[in-house]
Amino acid sequence: MGGGGNLVDGVRRWLFFQRRPSSSSSSNNHDQIQNPPTVSNPNDDEDLKKLTDPSKLRQIKVQQRNHLPMEKKGIPNAEFFTEYGEANRYQIQEVVGKGSYGVVGSAIDTHTGERVAIKKINDVFDHISDATRILREIKLLRLLLHPDVVEIKHIMLPPSRREFRDVYVVFELMESDLHQVIKANDDLTPEHHQFFLYQLLRGLKYVHAANVFHRDLKPKNILANADCKLKICDFGLARVSFNDAPTAIFWTDYVATRWYRAPELCGSFFSKYTPAIDIWSVGCIFAEMLLGKPLFPGKNVVHQLDIMTDFLGTPPPEAISKIRNDKARRYLGNMRKKQPVPFSKKFPKADPSALRLLERLIAFDPKDRPSAEEALADPYFNGLSSKVREPSTQPISKLEFEFERKKLTKDDIRELIYREILEYHPQMLEEYLRGGNQLSFMYPSGVDRFRRQFAHLEENQGPGGRSNALQRQHASLPRERVPASKNETVEERSNDIERRTTAAVASTLDSPKASQQAEGTENGGGGGYSARNLMKSSSISGSKCIGVQSKTNIEDSIVEEQDETVAVKVASLHNS
């Protein structure tokens, strides 16, 4: 496998010796591969619910599915998963989600009777960037064991170590997501708001304690059940910071849905990231619970900054200096003075203590936002918050994410994903760590059987079931990208436009000098930083203008790019 293979084999040998019992090993050595950290007793969540008044914290409405018998769907008796002699484990029921990455089916774990979501990720290794994202997420979800983070139950063993293409991940099945809950429940009580925010902050405290930044928190990435249980999902864009690196780190990709993106990230590929970006996103989600609609539904970078300042007021110079994008920073600096709108006027029915906390969460300056732990100590959570139910953890070991620092081949990533899969197959893992080189297996693989089941489900999914299949009712890894329905939201239409312009954005990534020259010609040498000039920014940012026409409204003419592969091209331009 070349240089990458040496890395993988070396880590594998090292892991074997680390797993051998040793009285001299130190549990405080953070450079060792850490075992999954312990969390609070699962019954703590039951105790948490008892702290609320059951008559007030009623069940929420979630979308219900009609689970028809398999025979009525034209599907024969289910073929069951077989893995190393362990037969009849999962019984596939139906397709509940479908996208360009693969298919999600609901299933029954016949060992426990539990309903699960099984995600088939197609052709994982066609693109190294996608495979790396999948590796990153399954690794993070293995390490971040917490009641408020979605759990991977199992990953199916592939039929061949060196040749597998698809990955099957078994998640706990959640009924809906917070986006759908907010849409379907216009009568959420203050107790609901408090309980939802508490769970988000409790989960985020744990994630941040592991030195992980989620970077894409939004209602669609918060799974929900009718009993008001929330879980954070979709860690494909998350990153880990390490003890030997600065607290604020530069990463060269473009993340976070614009409506929930912190102002210091607006319009920039290259940004300083701190835990405060996740706190801002949680604040926007909390505001959406209170309002019943998004707080900052910006159409583009300029509009996003405008509606933020319309509500929060013009930020002070110190806060403006934190904006990474030069044109956005100058645009804010030249903005007319705006006074903040009182939160009680924007949210007239909200609890005053909730608004005081919200004001801290969405402070324009990141240094003014509390940490998740500090937010949990806010008086808003009096009677609910408890250190016993708010577990922390140790920072994730640097060795777990050594692959992020290397240039890996497809075979390298395949081996690393295989290594992650073995975490759910202890006997095979022991053989692997001893240096076993088994390439194929004696028993029929569950993946082979599942491939046939999914294919049959997809073939028998008629047009009438299409809308159901589009609904997101499962964990990520990664999110689906499907054609939008007629009832799609403004945000979804906007994001679809952004995705369709990916190629155009990539083609405009000329050298800075060429871009500046083109901009100077188009602007006629003007030097002002108006909204139009920001739209035509020559900086390496998400505010690239595609096909600008003079009569086009500025709010419709900025298109941002959210594809990680384009960010990589940007980074290569800077390094060349």
Curated annotation (Swiss-Prot):
Its EC number is 2.7.11.24. GO terms for molecular function: ATP binding; MAP kinase activity; protein serine kinase activity. Residues 90-381 form the Protein kinase domain. It catalyses: L-seryl-[protein] + ATP = O-phospho-L-seryl-[protein] + ADP + H(+); L-threonyl-[protein] + ATP = O-phospho-L-threonyl-[protein] + ADP + H(+). Keywords: ATP-binding, Kinase, Nucleotide-binding, Phosphoprotein, Serine/threonine-protein kinase, Transferase. Dually phosphorylated on Thr-252 and Tyr-254, which activates the enzyme. Residues 477-501 have a biased composition (Basic and acidic residues). InterPro entries: Kinase-like_dom_sf, MAP_kinase, MAP_kinase_CS, Prot_kinase_dom, Protein_kinase_ATP_BS. Belongs to the protein kinase superfamily. CMGC Ser/Thr protein kinase family. MAP kinase subfamily. The modification Phosphothreonine is found at residues 252, 257. Transmembrane segments: none annotated. A motif (TXY) lies at residues 252-254. Activated by threonine and tyrosine phosphorylation. The TXY motif contains the threonine and tyrosine residues whose phosphorylation activates the MAP kinases. Residues 28-42, 504-520 have a biased composition (Polar residues). This is Mitogen-activated protein kinase 15. Interacts with MKK7. The modification Phosphotyrosine is found at residue 254. Residues 20-50, 458-535 are annotated as: Disordered. The keyword Ribosomal protein does not apply. Pfam families: Pkinase (PF00069). ATP binds at residues 96-104, 119. The active site is at 216 (proton acceptor).
